[in-house]
Amino acid sequence: MKFFIDTANLEEIKHAHELGILAGVTTNPSLVAKENVSFHDRLREITSIVSGSVSAEVISTDAAGMIAEGEELAKIAPNITIKVPMTPEGLKAVKAFSEKGIQTNVTLVFTANQALLAARAGATYVSPFLGRLDDIGHNGLELISTIAEIFNIHGIETEIIAASIRHPHHVTEAALRGAHIATVPYKVLMQLFNHPLTDQGIEKFLADWNRQK
């Protein structure tokens, strides 16, 4: 499973990139708004750092508007992926982008049927939202398993991005259940490194080394 980072913060992206684990970035209008910067300028900055997929979301609600927005976003860099909502109009846009060779990420996926529809429209990625399903008492991780099984049975190449990741357990379980990618907030990404026994082991090795000097 690959790691994307879910942020529009440049310092977070730079740090994750320096760690050597970053395969891509996902953004959305809310994340960009927090940064108080030009959307297009920030995308240029991100794509100058990250060579993998960088998801940029359209805000139009009709297919024609999404296509117009997406075509402009795709001009920023060849690794821009157009993030499109899981709606009938969104899937019309996905089909058009697919025919033009523009990558797409269908977001706000909450059912296996939605994921299958998006894949058949030509989506490069689908993003089921784990945390938001958990919030309403549904099993987001089970959804990952179901989508992965359906895609495997039918030979579908669309990749599954586990999104709305809230904690490290989501990451582990998404990997076990067949997600191709986890897009992870910076805070959760850094939590993946931590275990008290790792810290204790380092301290012991250093103490032992210093004693023998």
Curated annotation (Swiss-Prot):
Family from the record: Belongs to the transaldolase family. Type 3B subfamily.
Compartments where located: Cytoplasm
NCBIfam families recorded: fsa_talC_mipB (TIGR00875)
One GO term (biological process): carbohydrate metabolic process
Keywords, alphabetical: Cytoplasm, Pentose shunt, Schiff base, Transferase
InterPro entries, A to Z: Aldolase_TIM, TAL/FSA, Transaldolase_3B, Transaldolase_3B/F6P_aldolase, Transaldolase_AS, TSA/FSA_arc/bac
Name of the gene: tal
PANTHER family in UniProt: TRANSALDOLASE (PTHR10683:SF36)
Active site (UniProt): 83 (schiff-base intermediate with substrate)
EC number per UniProt: 2.2.1.2
Function (record text): Transaldolase is important for the balance of metabolites in the pentose-phosphate pathway.
Enzyme's top EC category: transferase
Name of the protein in its database record: Probable transaldolase
Gene Ontology CC terms, in alphabetical order: cytoplasm
Pathway: Carbohydrate degradation; pentose phosphate pathway; D-glyceraldehyde 3-phosphate and beta-D-fructose 6-phosphate from D-ribose 5-phosphate and D-xylulose 5-phosphate (non-oxidative stage): step 2/3
Catalyzed chemical reaction(s): D-sedoheptulose 7-phosphate + D-glyceraldehyde 3-phosphate = D-erythrose 4-phosphate + beta-D-fructose 6-phosphate
Cross-referenced Pfam families: TAL_FSA
Principal localisation: cytoplasm
Single GO MF descriptor: aldehyde-lyase activity
